[in-house]
Amino acid sequence: MLAHLFSGIAKWAQDSSGALTILPDCATELPEGILNDDGTVTYTYTLKDGLTWSNGDPLKASDFVFAWNRAASAALGADYGYMFEVIKGYEDVANGVEGAKLAVEAPDDKTLVVTLANTISYWNELLAFPTYYPVHEATVASEAWATDPSTYVCNGPYTMSGWEHGSIITLTKNDSFHNAAEVTMPTIRCHLSDDSNNMLANFKNGTWLLIDDVPTNEIAALKTEYPDEFVVAGQIGTYYVCWNINERILPEDSTLEGVEAETAQAEIRRAISLLFDRNYIVNEIAQGGQVPASSFVAMGMTNPDGTQFYKTAHSTNDAFDGYYDVREEAFESNVDKALEVLAKYYK
């Protein structure tokens, strides 16, 4: 929803082939950074002409300076404040050092200069993330600004025109948006629900046009019933089971100490992990297109050279990628190995 209400330096958009890519939004272009002698990297952005807030105030480069320092500050304690750690000066700002500021400046109303602590390959991706959106300084001085459409000042393709708390948020096209000609839907009604059964019922009866969750037990049928509409979207993340066990998991009568004890406990933890049938979990329980995890770092996270991290994280001559062999045909062998380890320590 924030992407409808705010506009940042950059944005995600579809290119001519339909693939998602990052394009300039409030900025005229996304230039290459300049490498400084001390290893820092400086980027200079020029804002487009005529940018305004929804209340008519001009949008200035200083709005980004304020918003980024606010989001990174210890005083705000924002969940995503850490995303500014790539910018020089972040540690002092995050730790609440008096007078500390991020290395972000606005020499004039249309120029934004930011210096990163070092080279960052994903800098443009950060610029397109909602945490990097600007906020209207005078508006956010009131903590309640974001809970009422009458005080919700934004700069995106839509404004908030209605909010029935716990029910519906209504967005209306922002005619003063810098790219308003490309905004084709005059109104978006966002129904608030955390009930997947309710979501699906409203989609089926035509009340809602888009939903982002369905009951797990309906997935198989929906793939057949709505072959074009039902889409499983990728998401980078790892779900895991956390065992509530003591730090020392060796039997009480074990005589192992020091490095030997640590090595043994690592073997035991690995053995427990091998007992999980990951394929059964994703295919029979989750059913949402998840894939078995062979490392804690999810598929989709890449090394600087573009290779998948999980494939190189545990480089061995084994026939599988990652730390565990998660192929279906390997499960029986995994269990045998796990039981062998557990039998060695628990007799």
Language-model features: locations:
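N-terminal lobe/hinge region of extracytoplasmic solute-binding protein
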Residues: 1-36, 153
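A local structural motif
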Residues: 19, 43, 114, 180-191
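Surface-exposed binding/hinge segments that line
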Residues: 44-46, 63-65, 76-137
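A structural "hinge/loop" feature
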Residues: 1-3, 23-27, 123-133, 242, ...
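Extracellular/periplasmic solute-recognition and catalytic clefts
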Residues: 161-172, 189-252, 279, 283-285, ...
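Gly/Pro-rich hinge or "lid" segments in bacterial periplasmic/extracellular proteins
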Residues: 14, 116-187, 197-198, 205
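Aromatic- and charge-enriched surface segment that lines or borders ligand/interaction sites
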Residues: 28-80, 113, 202, 259-263, ...
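Append "and occasionally in soluble cytosolic enzymes with long acidic Gly/Pro-rich linkers
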Residues: 263-347
